[in-house]
């Protein structure tokens, strides 16, 4: 589906939320932001997802990440539904704002439309999630179908990966978890790597004898 994608700057839209009107760029400020949509209020998967997002809010906050939800339901619906979300996930408080987009214009501008899920008013939002960097650019996007809930451990994992890669010349390998070794970017020479990573690094001994797979801890 064409539209906003990785590397694009999010539009500076003014939106109505459960915490009042906000401008997206002002809300994001210089922080990392998770902007996520859900198909509808008072639905089973969405209730579990937003509850888990609230449950993980302290972990995102530790990493300087703002949370912003969205669907096409009205604000009163959002506010009533929050009671169910918090009841289903004891101890979790939905303290992040949720955008109301009844005209379904914002989901189109943010590329969060599900082409297969519709109601009488048109296409519903997908289970989309954009991770936006401090520069207001999209760094990563998830697009899940209505039938599959998102995994907050994975969201937290990729946030850590993106933040480390923005600070160091590294990437995270397959199945990487926070605390595990990362790989040094291939455009970094060994001499440069010695300066950048004084803690040292280990080069994999490969049949090709090429020294491109170098592990370090950051």
Curated annotation (Swiss-Prot):
This is 1-Cys peroxiredoxin. It catalyses: a hydroperoxide + [thioredoxin]-dithiol = an alcohol + [thioredoxin]-disulfide + H2O. It holds the Pfam family 1-cysPrx_C. The active site is at 46 (cysteine sulfenic acid (-soh) intermediate). Residues 4-164 form the Thioredoxin domain. A motif (Bipartite nuclear localization signal) lies at residues 194-217. One of its GO terms (molecular function) is thioredoxin-dependent peroxiredoxin activity. Its EC number is 1.11.1.24. SUPFAM superfamilies: Thioredoxin-like. It comes from Medicago truncatula. The keyword Nucleotide-binding does not apply. The active site is a conserved redox-active cysteine residue, the peroxidatic cysteine (C(P)), which makes the nucleophilic attack on the peroxide substrate. The peroxide oxidizes the C(P)-SH to cysteine sulfenic acid (C(P)-SOH), which then reacts with another cysteine residue, the resolving cysteine (C(R)), to form a disulfide bridge. The disulfide is subsequently reduced by an appropriate electron donor to complete the catalytic cycle. In this 1-Cys peroxiredoxin, no C(R) is present and C(P) instead forms a disulfide with a cysteine from another protein or with a small thiol molecule. InterPro entries: AhpC/TSA (IPR000866), Peroxiredoxin_AhpC-typ (IPR024706), Peroxiredoxin_C (IPR019479), PRX_1cys (IPR045020), Thioredoxin-like_sf (IPR036249), Thioredoxin_domain (IPR013766). Keywords: Antioxidant, Cytoplasm, Nucleus, Oxidoreductase, Peroxidase, Redox-active center. Thiol-specific peroxidase that catalyzes the reduction of hydrogen peroxide and organic hydroperoxides to water and alcohols, respectively. Seems to contribute to the inhibition of germination during stress.
């Amino acid at each position: 589906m064409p539209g906003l994608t990785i590397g694009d700057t999010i539009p500076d839209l003014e939106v109505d939320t459960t915490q009042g009107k906000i401008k997206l760029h002002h809300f994001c400020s210089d922080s990392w932001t998770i902007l996520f949509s859900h198909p509808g209020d008072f639905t089973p998967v969405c209730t579990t997802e937003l509850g888990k997002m609230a449950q993980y809010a302290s972990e995102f906050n530790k990493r300087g990440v703002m949370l912003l939800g969205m669907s096409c339901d009205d604000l009163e619906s959002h506010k009533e539904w929050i009671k169910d979300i918090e009841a289903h996930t004891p101890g979790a408080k939905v303290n992040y704002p949720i955008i109301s987009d009844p005209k379904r214009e914002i989901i189109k501008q943010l590329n969060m439309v599900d082409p297969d899920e519709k109601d009488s008013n048109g296409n519903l939002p997908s289970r989309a999630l954009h991770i936006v960097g401090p520069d207001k650019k999209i760094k990563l996007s998830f697009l899940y179908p209505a039938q599959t809930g998102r995994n907050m451990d994975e969201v937290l994992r990729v946030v850590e990966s993106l933040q480390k890669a923005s600070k160091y010349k590294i990437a995270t390998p397959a199945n990487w978890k926070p605390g595990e070794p990362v790989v040094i970017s291939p455009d970094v020479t060994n001499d440069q790597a010695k300066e950048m990573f004084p803690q040292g690094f280990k080069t994999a001994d490969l049949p090709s004898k090429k020294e491109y797979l170098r592990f370090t801890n950051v």
